[in-house]
């Protein structure tokens, strides 16, 4: 099966500019809505913990993506890797990084805004551990996945829950 993946990352234009995405959320929407007409399966990628994004902003990204009802979604935490422009920025002017506990809680909340028809293809990633600068907790994918499961069970939260209230 063919699937086209869209690297949206965030719905916030100031963030997209900072991470050199060379597109706005509005231009993404134009492309995405046009593409959806093709009927080809699609998947949207988002990143939590992007520089200067708040929890509210990350939840807003999930809400807006949820309204698009993509076929699939991949959610990642920001990875700062050696040899990248972002690493240089981080070394020169460190910014706050998302904690593992915050990531787990935010992902659980984000899932509430995603339709049950959207396949969750990934809820954490694990980049090259040899190149990872920060946050180091992202290297322990199993712990993150277990943390999300535990949080959801303890807080009676699940994919699509917020949509049931709308």
What are these regions (language model features)?
Residues 1-43, 47-68, 86-101:
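Conserved non-cysteine loop/helix-boundary elements of the Radical SAM core domain that shape
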Residues 1-2, 75-79:
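Short low-complexity stretches enriched in small and charged residues
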Residues 72, 80-166:
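Auxiliary Fe-S-binding modules of radical SAM enzymes
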Residues 8-10, 77-79, 124:
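Short, small-residue-rich loop/turn micro-motifs
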